[in-house]
Amino acid sequence: LVNTHFETPHGLDSDEHYTTAYELALLSNYALKNPTFAKIVGTKNYTITINGYLKALNNTNELLGNMDGIYGIKTGFTNGANRCLVTACKRNNMDIICVVLGADTKKFRTLDSIKLINYVLNNFEIVNLQNLVNNEFDTWKNKHLKSILVNKAIPYNLEVSLESLKNPEIPIRKNLITSLSFNVNYKNYFEAPLDINTTIGSLEI
């Protein structure tokens, strides 16, 4: 986080207490990895006992329990920030973190959140790039592997493999999926001996 600074634990307005919508989304995504946090922000109602009396606690997130896939996270309000809402939604194999800041009313806060979530659901799709990359790599091997010369080595005894993607599944705009292109850049000459895991090229998407 580079544009976030916390001065107090309560979050009331202060010149030195600030963040951005993007970094609030990053922080929320990290916080959801904590099972206790995830359980609390995903709970619609809870009853506690105070001095022998029952006290009902109601989550102020209007979307929780009223929109498919919503599982958190937090409403907020100060005079400086106005109405805020960070929402977590899981649908269509996507985990969406939506941040709305500075809304004039609760209604606008909720409606803007719904619009943003629906925009993502209608325009993006999770694509497994690893499968596409593997297919492209196999095609490249069949066409070009034998053109790579390793001087002083046994001809055609070169074995190559593809490093797995760290994040193989990513959201991509639906109208861009069919236009994805791949380009393989590689060296075609080496001197033996070659170390295991020598990089001979790269595949760009």
State the predicted function of each range.
Residues 1-2:
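Short, charged, amphipathic alpha-helices and their helix-cap/turn boundaries
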Residues 9:
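Short, conserved loop-to-beta-strand elements that form functional interface hotspots
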Residues 13-205:
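Domain-terminus/edge residues, biased toward the C-terminal soluble/receptor-binding domains
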